[in-house]
A protein has these predicted regions:
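Non-transmembrane, aqueous-exposed alpha-helical and coiled segments at domain scale
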Residues: 1-400
Length: 400
């Protein structure tokens, strides 16, 4: 790879062993993808997990004297304050150690998986290094920024060095759609877009352009679409005419070429996809988990509306950012929800078995296929339904 004088000095250790280590990793990643050079990045987001490999790697950089050239935002681990009675002493120390390491590196401890909404919002064409698959897709597609689907390690190394290898989504020629996806279905709710995202098996590999969708799509629907595309497949970018950033800037979606494939997604496809992912449920419902990805304020308000003043018989857990939880507290929304059996949990991911293990074997429901996928890896099975159905079942404490 062609390195600048500054990059070569960093690799040679002129700025410390930690930065040299991070630079060596970035060069290695670049060589894997035939990148010719490293380019500056202005933002980073690290999919911190507070799990062993994450702590080991970040700790190794810190011990070598690394610090971040760009202060990255970070994904959630788990709230020790909320879950303290359910956590072992080892789990508490695990999260505390994560905090110490990332604070030492100079990260912004936002603990949120939707940084693009408030804490870390890139502009059109900005070169960044985001891990967290829903964040990568939202940044690339909806905002028109440029990031590869970074790992937690490579995003952290980008934050430490200030550089990322130039390949993939950083290059214009790789950002054209090559799969035309005609959507012939009723797209009436945010949840419909989540299920559309689950159709990755039929969409197949590539960059999809979704055709036939409404020109007004909510932020929450676009978040859901991106999150679930990377449950059912591996996607860096998608386009929607007159909705996503490049498609709204006169961008030639297919780069003057015919698409490699044309796919139609019907209403039947959506129904069959959901049924295959989450078979029919019956019996009691003991809990409902919402907020994977983290809920927006508008989504939390919708939960209150759906509850309609009726206290839920099943526990409702809503995961969100600390900033939104704080806003809900200040507005009185959090207290009203608590009275109705719904609690807001900040700084927490569903993919943390130490928090949620007590739910194993208990029947629950969620509006997030991604959340259900994560939970199942910990032996926790949840039905997946739209938000209105989730709240209706939670109010009754049973499938109805």
């Amino acid at each position: 790879m062609k390195l600048t004088d500054h990059q070569q000095k960093m690799l040679d250790g002129a700025f410390g062993k930690g930065k040299a280590m991070a630079m060596q990793i970035q060069i290695g990643v670049g060589k894997c993808f035939d990148a010719e050079r490293l380019v500056p990045v202005s933002r980073a987001h690290v999919s911190l997990s507070a799990q062993e490999a994450d702590i080991w790697f970040a700790g190794k950089l810190l011990d070598a004297g690394a610090s971040c050239a760009i202060a990255p935002t970070v994904n959630p681990g788990y709230s020790v304050d909320y879950f303290r009675s359910r956590l072992t002493d080892a789990a508490v120390e695990n999260m505390r150690k994560t905090e110490r390491i990332y604070r030492g590196l100079g990260a912004r401890l936002t603990y949120c998986c939707t940084p693009y909404l408030a804490d870390n919002v890139p502009s059109y064409g900005e070169i960044i290094a985001f891990s967290e698959t829903n964040a990568t897709l939202y940044a690339n597609a909806v905002l028109g920024a440029r990031t590869n689907r970074e790992s937690a390690a490579s995003a952290l190394c980008a934050a430490v060095t200030g550089y990322a290898p130039e390949y993939g989504m950083l290059l214009q020629e790789n950002r054209f759609a090559d799969v035309a996806v005609r959507v012939d279905a009723k797209m009436e709710s945010d949840f419909d877009y989540a299920v559309l995202g689950l159709c990755g098996k039929k969409i197949g590999k590539g960059i999809p352009a979704f055709l036939g969708l409404p020109e007004k799509i909510s932020t929450e629907a676009l978040i859901a679409l991106g999150a679930e595309l990377n449950v059912s497949g591996s996607y860096d970018l998608y386009h929607i005419p007159n909705v996503t950033a490049e498609a709204a800037h006169g961008f030639d979606l297919f780069g003057g070429k015919a698409p490699k494939r044309e796919v139609t997604i019907t209403q039947s496809d959506l129904e069959q996809t959901l049924e295959a992912f989450s078979p029919s449920a019956d019996g009691s419902i003991e809990y409902c988990i919402l907020g994977c990805p983290h809920y927006t304020y508008a989504q939390i308000e919708e939960v209150e509306r759906l509850l309609g003043g009726e206290k839920a018989k099943a526990d409702i857990h809503i995961l969100t950012s600390a900033a939104i939880k704080r806003a809900a507290k200040e507005s009185g929304l959090e207290d009203r929800l608590l009275d109705l059996g719904a609690d807001l949990i900040a700084d927490t991911c569903v993919d943390e078995a130490c928090c949620w293990g007590y739910l194993a074997g208990k029947p629950g429901v969620t509006d997030s296929p991604k959340g259900a996928y994560y939970m199942e890896t910990a032996g926790i099975r949840m039905a997946v339904r739209d938000t209105a159905t989730c709240i209706h079942w939670a109010k009754q404490g049973r499938v109805c």
